[in-house]
């Protein structure tokens, strides 16, 4: 499920917005998607550490 969401965010961020003012909403959505994608990328190592710690605890 996460990989599907990540692929959608990549596709959303790859769309280039036109310089017209009515595309401002799409630029905001693109920026939000970029922030979410960056957050997922930064959280990856922490999730791996938690998973390995949980495995060691068993």
From Swiss-Prot:
Q: Which InterPro entries match?
A: Cecropin (IPR000875)
Keyword presence, Secreted: yes
What does the UniProt entry say about where the protein is found?
Answer: Secreted
Against Pfam families, the record matches this protein to: Cecropin
Q: Which GO terms describe its cellular component?
A: extracellular region
As for family, the record states: Belongs to the cecropin family.
Q: What is its main location?
A: secreted
Disulfide cysteine pairs (residue numbers):
none
Q: Which UniProt keywords apply?
A: Antibiotic, Antimicrobial, Immunity, Innate immunity, Secreted, Signal
Q: Which residues form the signal peptide?
A: 1-21
Among the record's GO biological process terms, what is one?
innate immune response
Induction of its expression: Induced as part of the humoral response to a bacterial invasion. Transcripts appear within the immunized fat body.
Q: What does this protein do?
A: Cecropins have lytic and antibacterial activity against several Gram-positive and Gram-negative bacteria.
Is Lipid metabolism included in the keywords of this UniProt record? no
Q: Which domain of life is it from?
A: Eukaryota
Please state what the protein is called: Cecropin-B
